[in-house]
Amino acid sequence: MKRGAVRAATTVTVFLAALEIGLRIYNPFPFRVRGDHIVLPAHQSYTISHPGAVRMDPVTHVTKNSLGFRGPEPPRDWSERLTILTIGGSTTECLFLSDGKTWTDELRRRIDVIRPDVWIDNAGFEGHSTFGHLVLLREFVVSLRPKIAIFLTGYNDMKIASALPIDSELNPHNLSAGHRALTWMADHSEVAAVAENLIRMKRTYEANVRTTEVDLPGLPRRTLDDERTNAILEEHRTKSLSGYASRLAEIVRISRQNGIEPILMTQPALYGDVIDPSSDVALGAVAIGPLSNGRAEWQSLELYNDVTRRLSVDAGVPLIDLAREMPKDSRYFTDWVH
């Protein structure tokens, strides 16, 4: 029995060593987080299918430049240009929109009419909250030093109160001792990096952090009394808001400390206590998740938007209040926030 155990251990060791060598030569898994660091997907392109899509294109084509961002290559006359990065989660990266169709692309076209010296790239990272934005800022944006960084934040920070976000694992304080060990191994081993990212993919799927279309007329309705609505709001107030405020203030501080002027954006959403003009559906009564509805979700998101608004006033940061400017009309959305 002992000899068999030794033989099995030797076989496993040889297999893992061979797998490690093979993955170091060629790794077919282009994961964008390794250990507690971001790996930008430089010079990568994706073709993403959306079976059964109605509002989204059935196939989207996404290209990343030498920086790992969406958009044009950085100009050689960098110091002479007005350089801008847009930073956010999936509502900024927009993997469900092909090249040229994101809001960053539209912003570039509009600014180019009056400022042809502008360079704008999309540094959005699907699934990231302000935890991930801080890592991106420290590891990449500070050294790149654009003149302006536009931050669209809020929605993914809500997920921290109810589900493990993709990027919470970028903060070692959020990890168990065992997971910290796996993170350390992922920094030094291709096999461990693949294993860790497969775990992240599973958790992301289970947390429902993904993009789908919403069929408003087919959704169930849910009525919540004031007591239940207030309980949902109080959970956000006690679990997430202060941390979000601290991280957003840190983003502003680091940006300005490094000569980058931040611009804040509030997060719009389709849900709210209104009637959708395109479908005549009462958005406030639509059931969202296992416990909430459109009215409660909008009130929850507005707690985070209010944090952004207050920081804009207190720190003198320019604000684009998109949450109040964008119409709640399903013509402009594929799901609740995209």
Predicted regions and their residues:
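Histidine-centered active-site loop/cap adjacent to the catalytic His
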Residues: 5-7, 244, 310-320, 333-338
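Proline-aspartate-enriched helix->loop->beta-strand connector
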Residues: 141-150
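Conserved beta-strand elements of the Class I
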Residues: 83-87, 121, 149-151
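Structural motif
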Residues: 126-137
